[in-house]
Design a protein with these regions (language model features):
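Catalytic core of membrane glycerolipid acyltransferases/transacylases, capturing the structured
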Residues: 1-41, 49
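Non-catalytic C-terminal accessory region of glycerolipid acyltransferases
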Residues: 45-150
Length: 150
């Protein structure tokens, strides 16, 4: 799947500080709409930055598990995305990704050549009538259903 350039300019990513550790990566993050968070010191500030981005009508890509899978299975979802969606009344567009673990297993630094990764954008989930927990569960359920995981 490709995202149009115009959409990408309005799209932000959420990344842990440990992944943006050197000056070059920090420079690239600033130039490419990456909101960097420090789990120990700046969590509240980074959530506020994401809220401001959403209030301006922009998009944020958040990986709800907060990390890569260690075994190829879907892990527990963090609630940050559900809180932002519910508090700001913005929809969530779940994305089902398959083949990423096979292409780059835990502990590897280079992907396997010619690996196929499928990305599927699912129907939006609207926060109305949901708690943070139920919103998170609906999103997870739709992704699992799309990936044919029981």
């Amino acid at each position: 799947s490709f995202i149009k350039r115009r959409t990408m300019r309005k799209t932000y990513f959420y990344a842990k500080k440990k992944h943006v550790s050197n000056r070059f990566l920090q420079f690239m993050a600033r130039r490419n709409n990456v909101i960097v968070m420090d789990l120990h010191n700046e969590l509240k500030e980074s959530i506020q930055k994401m809220a401001e981005v959403l209030k301006r009508g922009r998009n944020i890509i958040i990986f709800p598990e907060g990390t890569r899978t260690k075994d190829g299975m879907i892990g527990d979802f963090k609630k940050t995305f559900a809180i932002l969606s519910a508090e700001l009344n913005v929809p969530i567009v779940p994305v089902a990704i398959s083949g990423a673990f096979e292409a780059l297993p835990t502990g590897k630094h280079l992907p396997k050549l010619f690996s196929k990764i499928n990305v599927k954008f699912l129907q939006p989930v609207y926060p109305t009538g949901h708690t943070y927990e139920s919103l998170s569960e609906v999103v997870k359920s739709r992704i699992k259903h799309s990936l044919k995981i029981v």
